[in-house]
Amino acid sequence: MRFQEKLHQYSKEEIWEEYCGFLTLSSAEFMNIQNRLLLEQMELWSSSGLGQSILKGKQPRTISEFREMVPLTTYEDYAPTLLAKQVGSLPGDPVLWVQTTWEGGVHPIKVAPYTKAMLDTFKHNVMSCLILSTSQKKGEFDVNVTDHMLYALAPMPFVTGLLPLLFKDEIDIEFLPSVRDAVKMTFKERNVQ
């Protein structure tokens, strides 16, 4: 169900709980969730070619073992695999790749794969941010299908270019200028008119 349908079918309190309920978690509850998510990611990463290139055959089973076995890494450690977009070495199949500049790096850009699961989580988080950005207090927010938003974003393949795509899946908020027009304009052109 799209977010805009939830606006008509659920109370603001129910929507708040779904998207912003994490704000009321205790520290222990929050850490339990984070540890579970870290274990899930650790298992996926450890069994991938990319993970094994760092682990050198080791298989950590706990977060403590992972911390002991895995050295601190930087993007430089992953660059050969990611820049070549070696999908077979990744923990999951990417749906798309985003990029950013690489200040101080050997190459001019960094690229990062996004899987369907990552995009779904990102979309949920974007909607949470939209709710929080329009709220005055817990359970109250001001999001409507008729809202307009300034397109002051770098377009795809930069990660900010995902925002209009993710919004489109959830709510018919209009961007000004329209996404179709904005992606053809320079940053200056988008923000001067």
Regions flagged by a language model, labelled:
Residues 1-193:
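Nucleotide 5′-phosphate-binding alpha/beta core
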